A protein has these predicted regions:
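Short acidic, glycine/serine/threonine-rich loops at helix termini
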Residues: 28-30, 136-140, 267, 299
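Cap/insert and terminal regions of metallo-dependent hydrolase folds
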Residues: 106-109, 124, 203-312
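Metallo-beta-lactamase
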Residues: 131-214, 308-319
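Active-site-proximal beta-strand elements of phosphoester/diester hydrolases
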Residues: 15-19, 70-74, 178-184, 225-231
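Active-site metal-binding motif and surrounding structural segment of the metallo-beta-lactamase
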Residues: 80-127, 132, 247-254
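Active-site metal-binding loops of divalent metal-dependent hydrolases
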Residues: 20-22, 75-77, 104, 129-131, ...
Length: 320
């Protein structure tokens, strides 16, 4: 596994399958870019269905010549949702070569242990050290503290075969075909993070900048960067700008994932985010998860040619 950023390799194709998101619609239609699983198989509509939850998980497949790699990015909220959807989509967990966790919050780590139990042999787990930070809180205006569940335990992960790769810096994976950003530089003035997030460290309460927030990027030959975020607590614009900086690649072809624009704290920056994304001119824009309904609706209005509605089970394919 390399760590020289200049050696990020171009790829021929990337396939991004949504294993979990906040929304599912079994009646959406296919396009040249996105494939939706059919309602029926062999003439029969199944009695069971794909499920959605407030969480995110994606299976990313990379192709270059005869070489291919499979990455699992995040694992949803519940302990059962992603596994259930993998079974419905006939995905074999043993295909997973590397797991990347975007950050330590519960809605991105829920099915991690059950998945590790189904993977035979050790598997690299790329994660920021602060993902293990605990206790973490939401602090309300009246001073009440809401404790985040501690879902990540190093000893348990290692016992189940996870080969922990704790990284703060950008890291190349999948034979240098994908980049995990590590800590994202915060350079914009309007993306200020989660204002009521706190962390207890050495007995002291302090603001939690969620430094463990990270994304994945690949470079599709002849197209440009495909950037995949988890929650983008660092800010989706900060994330895009940082990927451009560390790769030296300016063309942004696609941005997919959580943009964290939902709720009272973040809705005021929806329009500024739209303005910044417009200048980047992505050809494909797929907001998911914590982007929120209002922001997703605005993206659909402002970017009718590039916006694609996500749904659990959707596979996005970008080819050189």
């Amino acid at each position: 596994m390399g760590n020289e950023l200049e050696s990020l390799q171009t790829i021929d194709r990337v396939e991004i399958l949504t294993l979990m998101d906040n929304y599912v619609d079994v009646l959406l239609t296919n396009t040249d870019i996105v494939y939706r699983p059919p309602l029926a198989k062999d003439g029969q509509i199944p009695a069971d269905t794909l499920v959605a939850e407030h969480g995110l998980s994606m299976l990313i497949k990379l192709y270059r010549g005869t070489e291919s790699h499979t990455i699992l990015f995040d694992t949803g909220y519940s302990s059962i949702g992603v596994i259930h959807n993998m079974e419905m989509l006939e995905i074999d967990p043993s295909e997973i070569e590397t797991i990347v966790i975007s950050h330590g919050h519960m809605d991105h780590t829920g099915t991690l242990y059950p998945i590790l139990e189904k993977i035979s042999g050790p598997v690299p787990l790329v994660i920021h050290p602060d993902a293990f930070a605990s206790p973490r809180y939401f602090v309300l205006e009246d001073g009440r503290k809401l404790l985040f569940p501690q879902t990540l335990d190093k000893a348990r992960l290692e016992k189940l075969g996870a080969r922990l790769m704790e990284r703060r810096e950008p890291t190349l994976i999948a034979d240098d075909m994908a980049l995990v950003t590590g800590e994202v530089e915060r350079t914009t003035t309007f993306e200020k993070g989660l204002p009521n997030a706190y962390l207890e460290r050495n007995g002291n309460m302090e603001k939690d900048p969620i430094l463990d927030d990270q994304a994945i990027a690949v470079h599709v030959r002849g197209k440009g960067l495909v950037i995949i975020s988890g929650c983008a607590h660092a800010g989706i614009i900060n994330t895009i700008l940082y990927v451009r900086k560390v790769t030296g690649i300016s063309d942004v072809h696609a941005v997919l994932g959580g943009f964290h624009l939902s709720g009272a704290f973040f809705e005021p920056i929806i329009e500024e985010t739209i303005n910044k994304i417009r200048k980047l001119e992505p050809k494909i824009l797929v907001p998911m998860h914590c982007t929120g309904w209002k922001a997703i609706h605005r993206f659909s209005e402002e970017f009718p040619d590039s916006f694609i509605l996500n749904s659990v089970g959707s596979t996005f394919t970008i080819v050189s």
